[in-house]
């Protein structure tokens, strides 16, 4: 598709600020879905009527985590097993003059506008209802590359309340509208069409999730590195980057994005391969003479140390690593790579050879505009303790592991 058919973020923000709809897709290079997005506080009955006729999808409203707490919008389910981790809350209807069943165009428009009205409170809504709020991650598209976060970011950047209306666009036959369909809608109704990829780049230029606080030379058993410590504005953690050589050139850089594992990295636990992967990555960077290891404080694939140990207890009772997380009410992997991407951006990394076995990590980092020219395997020979763990990562989480772990029937 020609890029000239994709509108600028600035032009879309102008339209949103004027109370218009825009179409948002993931990336112009992909045959993916598109959503109508607008600022919730600019919604009209005419807009909702148009969306129900032309989009045919589910009317949702993206809110910040703080706004969800203010309005007491609790998660729809305690155990979210949705494929894309969409953070639905309980559905709502507005309690207001003229609102009856909640399903009419007027009723839904009122509910959406009131969700975007800062004077609304928890008692302004009945539950369940006909509008589905979604909780956006703090940090927006720089933390999660999704339409939910895009809706909040776009509303905020347009000078509106940071609450966004979004609705998937379906084809007339009920299937998902694809790129050609979305372009037809764009031209027919004179709407702006933008990509989340461009929004991420726009936010990368103007918003920072992390700030480099200090750096120092660190001699290690694997070699000498420059250690950069970063302060995070979203999770209040201190993250690190071990840097070898000049990584700010156009030549692809050997990179490892490693999440904290205190038990494996520090105490050499045999339950996982984390410590061995960390050591191997540092050795490979030292041998290369140039590279980066980003160390993110995302213990236990993002569930924290205490929950990780609870998961270990469940594994001792027969659960695998995925089942244990789900039994505790978590997804198999809660990590996000927005912070890691910003650290790499700060270091000047443009192209990378990424050391990972995890396809989600490749997709996650590419979503932030980083170019991965090669995936470098980082396989560790299993031991008697972690054999089943590695099989589960391969068979259930899609990790690209070719080691002799057995049949995987566990």
UniProtKB/Swiss-Prot annotation:
InterPro entries: DHBP_synth_RibB-like_a/b_dom, DHBP_synthase_RibB, GTP_cyclohydro_II, RibA, RibA-like_sf, Riboflavin_synth_RibBA
Keyword Zinc attached: yes
Organism of this sequence: Chlorobium phaeovibrioides (strain DSM 265 / 1930)
Region of interest: GTP cyclohydrolase II: 206-410
Protein name in UniProt: Riboflavin biosynthesis protein RibBA
UniProt keyword Hydrolase, yes or no: yes
Superkingdom classification of source: Bacteria
Gene name, Swiss-Prot/TrEMBL: ribBA
Positions that bind GTP: 256-260, 277, 299-301, 321, 356, 361
Catalysed reactions listed for this entry: D-ribulose 5-phosphate = (2S)-2-hydroxy-3-oxobutyl phosphate + formate + H(+); GTP + 4 H2O = 2,5-diamino-6-hydroxy-4-(5-phosphoribosylamino)-pyrimidine + formate + 2 phosphate + 3 H(+)
Cofactor note: Binds 2 divalent metal cations per subunit. Magnesium or manganese.
List of residues binding D-ribulose 5-phosphate: 30-31, 35, 144-148, 168
Region described as DHBP synthase: 1-205
A Pfam family matched in the record: DHBP_synthase
UniProt-recorded Gene Ontology molecular function terms: 3,4-dihydroxy-2-butanone-4-phosphate synthase activity; GTP binding; GTP cyclohydrolase II activity; magnesium ion binding; manganese ion binding; zinc ion binding
The EC number(s) this enzyme carries: 4.1.99.12, 3.5.4.25
């Amino acid at each position: 598709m020609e890029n000239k058919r994709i509108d600028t973020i600035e032009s879309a923000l102008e339209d949103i600020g004027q109370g218009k709809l825009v179409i948002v897709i993931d990336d112009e290079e992909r045959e993916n879905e598109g959503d109508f997005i607008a600022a919730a506080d600019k919604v009209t009955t005419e807009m909702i009527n148009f969306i129900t006729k032309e989009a045919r999808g589910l009317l949702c409203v993206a809110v910040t985590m703080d706004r969800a707490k203010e309005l007491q919008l609790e998660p729809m389910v305690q155990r979210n097993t949705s494929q894309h981790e969409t953070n639905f809350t309980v559905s709502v209807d507005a309690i207001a003059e003229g609102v009856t069943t909640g399903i009419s165009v007027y009723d839904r428009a009122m509910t959406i506008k009131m969700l975007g009205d800062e004077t609304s409170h928890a008692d302004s809504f009945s539950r369940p209802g006909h509008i589905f709020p979604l909780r956006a991650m703090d940090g927006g598209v720089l933390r999660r590359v999704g339409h939910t976060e895009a809706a909040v970011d776009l509303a905020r950047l347009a000078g509106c309340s940071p609450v966004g209306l979004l609705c998937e666009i379906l084809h007339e036959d009920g299937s998902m509208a694809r790129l050609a369909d979305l372009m037809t809608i764009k031209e027919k109704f004179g709407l702006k069409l933008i990509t989340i990829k461009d929004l991420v780049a726009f936010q990368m230029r103007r918003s920072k999730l992390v700030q480099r606080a200090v750096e120092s030379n660190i001699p290690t058993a694997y070699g000498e590195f420059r250690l950069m410590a970063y302060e995070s504005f979203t999770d209040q953690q201190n993250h690190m980057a071990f840097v070898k050589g000049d990584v700010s050139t156009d030549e692809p850089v050997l990179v490892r994005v490693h999440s904290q594992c205190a038990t494996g990295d520090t105490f050499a636990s045999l339950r996982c391969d984390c410590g061995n992967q960390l050591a191997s990555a540092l050795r490979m960077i030292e041998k290369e003479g140039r590279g980066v290891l980003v160390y993110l404080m995302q213990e236990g694939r993002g569930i924290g140390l205490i929950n990780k140990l609870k998961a270990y207890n469940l594994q001792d009772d027969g659960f695998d690593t995925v089942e244990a997380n789900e039994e505790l009410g978590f997804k198999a992997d809660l990590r996000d790579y927005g912070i890691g991407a910003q650290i790499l951006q700060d270091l000047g990394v443009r192209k990378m050879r990424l050391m990972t076995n995890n396809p989600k990590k490749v997709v996650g980092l590419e979503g932030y505009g980083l170019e991965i020219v090669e995936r470098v395997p980082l396989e560790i020979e299993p031991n008697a303790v972690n054999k089943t763990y590695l099989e589960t990562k391969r068979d259930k989480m899609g990790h690209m592991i070719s080691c002799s772990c057995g049949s995987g029937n566990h």
